[in-house]
Amino acid sequence: INALAEKYDMPILYSCHPRSRKRLEATGFKLDPRVRMHEPMGFHDYNCLQMNSFAVVSDSGTLPEESSFFASVGRPFPAVCIRTSTERPEALDKACFTLAGISERGLLQAVRTAVELDAEGSLPEAPVPDYADETVSTKVVKIIQSYTGVVDKMVWRKSL
């Protein structure tokens, strides 16, 4: 976070989970004065922040869906996830966000790339197709129903 504040010389809002705050305090880690710690936000407030940010850097598992959704409504934003893997490879395949890893070098490179693509107008403009599927609930019900017998027999050892 400090490296981003130094490189871009702009305020950074750090929506900090209470456990993270305690850990930072326990280690004595000092944040750059441009980094402003903030209590976790509600979903609506956080979405408004995302739409109006220079870039969004998060370890949230919902970042892929959020970046895909905002692209679909014409408000794409540079999204960078500080993780080494994702549960949403389909969003990665559609370039809705960038995985930065957890190193300072990887983070700086990912943010630079995402911001440059945004400046060029090269961020995705369409959502991940799976996320736009309006029949997903029906599909999930059918999948669960289809596997109930197999799971009962093989996992729970129920006699049918």
Positions of predicted regions on the chain:
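Nucleotide-activated sugar donor-binding and catalytic core shared by glycosyltransferases
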Residues: N2-M10, S15, S20-L160
